[in-house]
Regions:
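Acidic, surface-exposed loops and disordered segments
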Residues: 1-237
Length: 237
């Protein structure tokens, strides 16, 4: 097995970090690796806000109370970004259409691909991290904190640092429940219940809810109002 695949299969989320900085040279490598991710038509429809000051991390923690943010050596906010595209379009026409859902898919996928590259690069250098999607629940406040202009929105953040904890790799769904030959196959409730048991066994005494219960908590409720409100304010919907 290649070193790259071994590293990818060993991934765990790290939420506790030592009080050590990430050297600028390593940050440059991580962020340059992020830039090399695939991108729709090479539009590179995302930006990254790098946060290293404790004051800014503390302010962010007040909005998104995840200890990993406060402890991180560096926090990367990945932003879906059509602001740059708007400026490019204006060189040729007065009409700019961010394209609603399609524009959101383009920017979100570009950001996600770059973010995964960044995390993998960080792990290859001995760092750890966790992707934090809860930033979207405070989209309006984050837009103000980070001075995000029109046609931009927070997609997720990554807290990075020197790991101060170790976990076993979290079991994923069986491959046959995710990869289908030739055509889609709907899942049975038995397959969901089986994975509930796998996840509960993995979590042990830490288990408070099952995997399917967490699905119900997420998708049994309306979308967060802040996300849509910010997208409308930033002229993306």
């Amino acid at each position: 097995m290649s070193e790259t695949i071994t590293l990818m299969k060993a991934h765990t989320s790290v939420r506790r970090f030592k009080e050590q900085e990430i050297p600028q040279a390593d940050l440059n490598e991580i962020l340059t690796a992020a830039q090399m991710a695939s991108s729709w038509k090479n539009f590179q429809s995302y930006s990254v806000s790098l946060v290293r000051s404790q004051e800014k991390k503390d302010a962010l923690f007040e909005l998104v109370p995840q200890e990993a943010i406060r402890q991180s050596a560096a926090f990367l906010l990945f932003v879906g970004d059509l602001n740059r595209a708007e400026k490019g379009v204006r060189l040729h026409t007065d009409i700019f259409q961010p394209q609603g859902v399609e524009g959101l898919l383009i920017t979100s996928v570009d950001a996600a691909l770059a973010g995964q590259n960044a995390l993998l690069a960080a792990e290859s250098l001995g760092y750890g991290g966790v992707i934090i999607g809860l930033v979207r629940y405070k989209s309006v406040e984050l837009a103000e904190l980070f001075k995000l202009p029109d046609y931009t929105y927070p997609v997720f953040g990554i807290a990075l640092g020197v790991p101060n904890q170790q976990h076993d790799v979290k079991p994923r769904l069986p491959l046959e429940n995710v990869v289908f030959e030739e055509e889609y196959q709907e899942q049975s409730t038995e397959a969901i219940e089986a994975y509930d048991r796998v996840q509960t066994e993995y979590a042990g005494a830490r288990a408070t809810t099952t995997w399917s219960q967490r699905l119900a908590e997420q998708f049994g409720n309306p979308e967060p109002s802040s996300t849509r409100e910010n997208l409308e304010q930033k002229k993306l919907l």
